[in-house]
């Protein structure tokens, strides 16, 4: 390995940056383009903010759905119906 000039900043070291820009392509060649491409494309690791998923909006007939819920029979109490034994 060649010695690197200590006066150079780390991002200017030879081989630290690829000669071509990164692309959005996911082919094998582009996945191994540079370390960043390998981590994000090949391994699928990204530390960016996750987009929030929008909730599904209630339909216009939500009132009829609520009405049908009230017509359902009430659930039976669980446990021993006679009460606790001593």
Swiss-Prot record:
<keyword id="KW-0479">Metal-binding</keyword>
<dbReference type="GO" id="GO:0042783">
    <property type="term" value="P:symbiont-mediated evasion of host immune response"/>
</dbReference>
<dbReference type="GO" id="GO:0052170">
    <property type="term" value="P:symbiont-mediated suppression of host innate immune response"/>
</dbReference>
<dbReference type="GO" id="GO:0030430">
    <property type="term" value="C:host cell cytoplasm"/>
</dbReference>
<feature type="modified residue" description="N6-acetyllysine; by host PCAF">
    <location>
        <position position="28"/>
    </location>
</feature>
<dbReference type="GO" id="GO:0042025">
    <property type="term" value="C:host cell nucleus"/>
</dbReference>
<feature type="binding site">
    <location>
        <position position="27"/>
    </location>
    <ligand>
        <name>Zn(2+) 2</name>
    </ligand>
</feature>
<dbReference type="GO" id="GO:0001223">
    <property type="term" value="F:transcription coactivator binding"/>
</dbReference>
<keyword id="KW-0945">Host-virus interaction</keyword>
<dbReference type="GO" id="GO:0031491">
    <property type="term" value="F:nucleosome binding"/>
</dbReference>
<feature type="short sequence motif" description="Cell attachment site">
    <location>
        <begin position="78"/>
        <end position="80"/>
    </location>
</feature>
<protein>
    <recommendedName>
        <fullName>Protein Tat</fullName>
    </recommendedName>
</protein>
<dbReference type="GO" id="GO:0140313">
    <property type="term" value="F:molecular sequestering activity"/>
</dbReference>
<dbReference type="GO" id="GO:0039588">
    <property type="term" value="P:symbiont-mediated suppression of host antigen processing and presentation"/>
</dbReference>
<dbReference type="GO" id="GO:0006351">
    <property type="term" value="P:DNA-templated transcription"/>
</dbReference>
<feature type="modified residue" description="N6-acetyllysine; by host EP300 and GCN5L2">
    <location>
        <position position="50"/>
    </location>
</feature>
<dbReference type="GO" id="GO:0032968">
    <property type="term" value="P:positive regulation of transcription elongation by RNA polymerase II"/>
</dbReference>
<keyword id="KW-1048">Host nucleus</keyword>
<dbReference type="GO" id="GO:0039502">
    <property type="term" value="P:symbiont-mediated suppression of host type I interferon-mediated signaling pathway"/>
</dbReference>
<dbReference type="GO" id="GO:0046872">
    <property type="term" value="F:metal ion binding"/>
</dbReference>
<feature type="modified residue" description="N6-acetyllysine; by host EP300 and GCN5L2">
    <location>
        <position position="51"/>
    </location>
</feature>
<dbReference type="GO" id="GO:0050434">
    <property type="term" value="P:positive regulation of viral transcription"/>
</dbReference>
<keyword id="KW-0053">Apoptosis</keyword>
<keyword id="KW-0014">AIDS</keyword>
<keyword id="KW-1090">Inhibition of host innate immune response by virus</keyword>
<feature type="site" description="Essential for Tat translocation through the endosomal membrane">
    <location>
        <position position="11"/>
    </location>
</feature>
<comment type="function">
    <text>Transcriptional activator that increases RNA Pol II processivity, thereby increasing the level of full-length viral transcripts. Recognizes a hairpin structure at the 5'-LTR of the nascent viral mRNAs referred to as the transactivation responsive RNA element (TAR) and recruits the cyclin T1-CDK9 complex (P-TEFb complex) that will in turn hyperphosphorylate the RNA polymerase II to allow efficient elongation. The CDK9 component of P-TEFb and other Tat-activated kinases hyperphosphorylate the C-terminus of RNA Pol II that becomes stabilized and much more processive.</text>
</comment>
<dbReference type="GO" id="GO:0140537">
    <property type="term" value="F:transcription regulator activator activity"/>
</dbReference>
<dbReference type="GO" id="GO:0039525">
    <property type="term" value="P:symbiont-mediated perturbation of host chromatin organization"/>
</dbReference>
<dbReference type="GO" id="GO:0039606">
    <property type="term" value="P:symbiont-mediated suppression of host translation initiation"/>
</dbReference>
<dbReference type="Pfam" id="PF00539">
    <property type="entry name" value="Tat"/>
</dbReference>
<feature type="region of interest" description="Core">
    <location>
        <begin position="38"/>
        <end position="48"/>
    </location>
</feature>
<feature type="modified residue" description="Asymmetric dimethylarginine; by host PRMT6">
    <location>
        <position position="52"/>
    </location>
</feature>
<keyword id="KW-1126">Modulation of host PP1 activity by virus</keyword>
<keyword id="KW-0922">Interferon antiviral system evasion</keyword>
<feature type="region of interest" description="Interaction with the host capping enzyme RNGTT">
    <location>
        <begin position="49"/>
        <end position="86"/>
    </location>
</feature>
<keyword id="KW-1114">Inhibition of host interferon signaling pathway by virus</keyword>
<keyword id="KW-0862">Zinc</keyword>
<feature type="short sequence motif" description="Nuclear localization signal, RNA-binding (TAR), and protein transduction">
    <location>
        <begin position="49"/>
        <end position="57"/>
    </location>
</feature>
<feature type="binding site">
    <location>
        <position position="22"/>
    </location>
    <ligand>
        <name>Zn(2+) 1</name>
    </ligand>
</feature>
<feature type="region of interest" description="Disordered">
    <location>
        <begin position="48"/>
        <end position="86"/>
    </location>
</feature>
<feature type="compositionally biased region" description="Polar residues">
    <location>
        <begin position="60"/>
        <end position="77"/>
    </location>
</feature>
């Amino acid at each position: 390995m060649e010695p690197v000039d200590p006066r150079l900043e780390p991002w200017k070291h030879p081989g630290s940056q690829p000669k071509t820009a990164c692309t959005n392509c996911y082919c094998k060649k582009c996945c191994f383009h540079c370390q960043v491409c390998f981590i994000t494309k090949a391994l699928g690791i990204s530390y960016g903010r996750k987009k929030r998923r929008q909730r599904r909006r209630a339909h216009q007939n939500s009132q009829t759905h609520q009405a049908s819920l009230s017509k359902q029979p009430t659930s039976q109490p669980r446990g021993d119906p006679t009460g606790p034994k001593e």
